[in-house]
Swiss-Prot record:
Name of the protein described by the UniProt record: Large ribosomal subunit protein bL12
Lineage, uppermost ranks: Bacteria, Thermotogati, Thermotogota, Thermotogae, Thermotogales
Record's keyword terms, sorted: Ribonucleoprotein, Ribosomal protein
Repeat keyword on record: no
GO MF annotations in UniProt: mRNA binding; structural constituent of ribosome
Pfam families linked to this entry: Ribosomal_L12 (PF00542), Ribosomal_L12_N (PF16320)
Length: 129
C-alpha cells in the first residue's frame, strides 16, 4: 500500500473510526496526539497576523455544545449529517460540551452554517470554530 492509498483510505473513515484509529496508534506507539502546550506567551505584535488569518479562514469545525431537550432528534440529525451509525451518533451526541464533540471538521463556512441551522432547529446548540 502506497502512502497515497493510505491517505485515501483514511479520508474514507467516519469521525468515530478516526477517533478509534488515533487511540489505537497512541496505544501501539506509546505516544499522545494531544497538542503541546505553549510555555511562553506570544508577543503583542504577533496578534495582528493571527487576526488577519482568522478572517481568511476557509475551513471550519462544528462542535456540539448541547443537545437540549430533544436528544433523539439531535441524534437523528447528526446521523443524517455525518453518516454515522446509531451507536456512534448517540455516543457523539452524549459527548456534547466536550472539547472533542465535533460533528464535522474542516468544512466550508456555508456547510458549517447549514449544520448549525439543522442542529438548532431540533433544539441543539453548536459552536463553529
Amino acid at each position: 500500500m502506497t502512502l497515497e492509498e493510505l491517505v485515501k483510505a483514511i479520508e474514507g473513515l467516519t469521525v468515530a473510526e478516526l477517533a478509534e484509529l488515533v487511540k489505537m496508534l497512541e496505544e501501539r506507539f506509546g505516544v499522545s496526539a494531544a497538542a503541546p502546550v505553549m510555555a511562553a506567551m506570544p508577543v503583542a505584535g504577533a496578534a495582528a497576523p493571527s487576526a488577519a488569518a482568522a478572517e481568511e479562514k476557509d475551513s471550519f469545525d462544528v462542535l456540539l455544545k448541547s443537545f437540549g431537550a430533544k436528544k433523539v432528534e439531535v441524534i437523528k440529525v447528526v446521523r443524517e449529517i455525518t453518516g454515522l451509525g446509531l451507536k456512534e451518533a448517540k455516543d457523539l451526541v452524549e459527548k456534547a460540551g466536550a472539547a472533542d464533540a465535533f460533528i464535522k471538521q474542516g468544512v466550508k463556512k456555508e456547510e458549517a452554517e447549514e449544520i448549525k441551522k439543522k442542529i438548532t432547529e431540533v433544539g441543539g446548540e453548536v459552536e463553529i470554530k
